[in-house]
Amino acid sequence: MSSKFHSSIPLNAKQIYSRDLKWLDGSKLMIAEVSGPSLGVGFEIAYALFHKKIPVLAVYHEKADQISSMIHGCNDKKLTIKKYNDLDDLVNNIKTFISNNGGN
C-alpha cells in the first residue's frame, strides 16, 4: 500500500474530473479508501450512490483519526463501511464485498 499512482501524462482539473466520472460510469461497484479526508473521494462516493446507484465499499484503517461524518452517517443500503487493520484484512473485506455484489 506504499506505492503511489502517478499518471504519465499530467492532467488538469477538468481532465481528472472527466476521467474519474468516466471510470465510475463504466463501473458496477466502487471501492473507496476513506482513512483521510478527501472532498474528491466524497464526491465520487455520492456520484456512485445517488447518480449511478451502484454499491460502494468505504474502507478505513483502524488507526484513522476519524472518517467523515457524512460517510459514516449515510444510511444508504448500497453503502458498506468496513474498518481494516492490515493488508490481509483489507483484501478480505474487498473480496467479501465483491462476492456479495455479484462479482467473481
Predicted features and spans:
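Conserved catalytic or regulatory cores that recognize and/or transform ribose-phosphate-containing ligands
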Residues: 1-104
